[in-house]
Amino acid sequence: MPEFPEEFIAPMISSTVTMLILVWLIFARAAQRLSLALWVGLALLVWLAAVLLLSPHGFFLKLSLHPIPNIGLLFVPMIIGINFLAKSVVFQKLVDNIYQPWLIGVQISRMMGMIFLTLYARGLMPAEFAFPSGIGDIVVGITAPVIAAILFFNLPFSRILAIGWNIIGFADLVAAIILGFLTSPTPYQFLALDNPNYFLFDFPLALVPLFAVPLSLLLHIFSLRVLLKQASISRDYLTQE
């Protein structure tokens, strides 16, 4: 098995920590109680710490959860987040209070997808994963501040554009997860058989699929909830007039 380039380890960790801090600041600004902001921060820290502790030595490629590889654990934070959004009134209010331009703008962190193309150029990642996932993330990351600015200035059709952008960004991540499963050395590998995706679920690259990707998916869901709710209220208001 080839070795992961050491020069990318520090940037991967720092980028992920920066994303965590920015997301926490966004939630802390929306929280009406300090205790709620602290709980959100603690949850993010525990999540990141778990990935950092478990990702070395190929833990997420093992089959102790057979027939589902340990990489199936990436769905746990998403399930927890969606469950809170569906059942917790306090969390629903927190999400509704988040400033949308910030929630969308923070997805500039998706530029981390450039690492996939860099690894492909070095022959360390299969094209079947690197191209669609890397290019998709870069496009979403570049357009994130643009969509955030359009929302900030409340330009015409800004909400529709933001909804469409969120859907595209969400679909890109879902496709990346599927391709990650299909190209990694697990029982579900059907692509890149001659060049398996060894690094994707190992340290430090595991920070992307096991922290950044699920967190970004949740941010898309939170944003869509608020934007669709606002669109529904606007339609009702226009109908009453």
Where are these regions (language model features)?
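Hydrophobic transmembrane alpha-helical segments in integral membrane proteins
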Residues: 1-20, 62-74, 204-206
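Early transmembrane hairpin module of multi-pass membrane proteins
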Residues: 9, 37-81, 88-91, 95
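Hydrophobic cores of alpha-helical transmembrane segments in multi-pass inner/ER membrane proteins
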Residues: 13-22, 73-88, 139-148, 207-225
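Juxtamembrane "helix-exit" motif on the non-cytosolic side of transmembrane helices
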Residues: 26-30, 52-62, 90, 116-125
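Membrane-interfacial loop-to-transmembrane alpha-helix junctions, especially the N-terminal start
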Residues: 31-44, 97-104, 158-162
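Membrane-proximal helix-loop-helix units in multi-pass membrane proteins
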Residues: 87-158
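Hydrophobic alpha-helical membrane-insertion segments
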Residues: 162-179
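Short, membrane-exposed interhelical loops at transmembrane-helix boundaries
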Residues: 186-207
